[in-house]
Regions:
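C-terminal structural segment of proteins
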Residues: 1-180
Length: 180
């Protein structure tokens, strides 16, 4: 899936952490209980939210940030049947098991991603990166707003490049309600 540029492959991307890809460095995500080289090393592009003592890697997907802001649902099928996982619950925080990126069980497969109908009539996506193309976000934000008569009625905001999963800003969402 990851090599075919599918939605499922995009959702399942592994971290871009250089310590994950450098097999000479410790990485709890790659080899549990080996340590996290990024903790004391170069960590400019690592998590500022939701990190743990075991891992400070971030999720690389731009698409996932937008899906989180749009309250998407991941449809999954496996030996135990079908289920739906809220997008904000699909990816895991590292905790004590940073090698587990998501909440799929062994043998489960993503079959669909559903974006529900909503009342959002304004949406924005902004990505800050080191170069103009083919670069991961240093930080990104997806914003979806329902605006009526110049007043924000509902808001949904997610950030990327800042956590092990797309990070919802629920406090900011609530703060924006009623603002002009």
């Amino acid at each position: 899936l990851r090599n075919m540029a599918t939605t499922g492959g995009n959702i399942m991307q592994r971290t871009r952490c250089p310590y994950f890809y450098d097999t000479t460095m410790p990485c709890n995500k790659r080899q549990p209980q080996s340590g996290c080289g990024a903790m004391e090393g170069y960590n400019r592009m690592h998590a500022i939210f939701g990190a743990s003592e075991k891992c400070i890697a971030v999720h690389p997907s731009d698409m996932c940030v937008a899906l989180a802001a749009l309250n998407a649902t991941v449809h999954v099928s496996g030996a135990k049947g079908e289920k739906k996982i809220s997008f904000v619950d699909f990816h895991r925080l590292p905790g004590d098991t940073p090698q587990l990126d998501n909440n799929l069980q062994t043998g489960e497969l993503i079959t669909a991603v559903h974006i529900p109908a909503n009342r959002f009539n304004k949406s924005y996506y902004l990505k800050v990166r080191d170069r103009l193309s083919y670069a991961f976000a240093l930080v990104s934000v997806a914003v979806a707003l329902e605006v009526s008569d110049g007043v924000i009625k509902s808001a949904s905001i997610a950030m990327g490049g800042v956590a092990h999963k797309p990070w919802r800003l629920t406090v900011v969402e609530k703060f924006l309600i009623g603002k002009t």
